[in-house]
C-alpha cells in the first residue's frame, strides 16, 4: 500500500485530472455546457472543444453547438466528468430543434413572469 505524496494530491484535486475528458460545466447563470476540456489556467478559466449548450425545458431538450468555447473561471459553479458509457438523459426526454426549445423557453419565461405578477397582486391576502 502506497501513500500519495503532495504532488499526487494536488494533481487529483485540480482540473489537470479532467484534461482531454468530456465534461459538464454548470455556470452561474444556470447554463449547462458540455465539451472536452483542452486547457485551463490558475483562475479556472477553461477551454472546451466541441462544446454545446444543453437547454432543458420540461421533458424537452436541445444541444446547441458552440464549437471551441472559452469559459471565464468566475462563472463556473460546478465541473464534472461525463460517463461516456452511461445514458446522459432519462429515456422520457425528447430531443427537439433549437427553434422549438427557444419557443418553449419563451413560454416558460412568460408563465413564470405571470405567476410572479399574480403573487404580487395577491400579496395582501398574506398566503404562505
Curated annotation (Swiss-Prot):
Disruption of the gene: reported phenotype: No visible phenotype under normal growth conditions, but the double mutants lsm1a and lsm1b show severe developmental alterations, such as delayed seed germination, reduced root length, epinastic, chlorotic and small cotyledons, small and serrated leaves, abnormal venation in cotyledons and leaves, dwarf plants with early flowering, short siliques with reduced seed number and small morphologically alterated seeds.
Residues in Sm domain copies: 10-85
Coiled coil stretches, renumbered: none
GO biological process, one term: deadenylation-dependent decapping of nuclear-transcribed mRNA
Main localization (coarse): cytoplasm
Family of this protein: Belongs to the snRNP Sm proteins family.
Protein's name in the database: Sm-like protein LSM1B
Encoding gene per record: LSM1B
Amino acid at each position: 500500500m502506497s501513500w500519495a505524496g503532495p504532488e499526487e494530491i494536488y494533481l487529483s484535486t485540480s482540473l489537470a485530472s479532467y484534461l482531454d475528458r468530456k465534461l459538464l460545466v454548470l455556470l452561474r447563470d444556470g447554463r449547462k455546457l458540455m465539451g472536452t476540456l483542452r486547457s485551463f489556467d490558475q483562475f479556472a478559466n477553461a477551454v472546451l472543444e466541441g462544446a454545446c449548450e444543453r437547454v432543458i425545458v420540461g421533458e424537452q431538450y436541445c444541444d446547441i453547438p458552440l464549437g471551441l468555447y472559452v469559459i471565464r473561471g468566475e462563472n463556473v459553479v460546478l465541473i464534472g466528468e461525463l460517463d461516456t458509457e452511461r445514458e446522459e438523459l432519462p429515456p422520457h426526454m425528447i430531443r427537439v430543434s433549437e427553434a422549438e426549445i427557444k419557443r418553449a423557453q419563451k413560454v416558460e419565461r412568460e408563465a413564470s413572469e405571470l405567476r410572479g405578477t399574480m403573487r404580487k397582486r395577491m400579496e395582501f391576502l398574506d398566503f404562505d
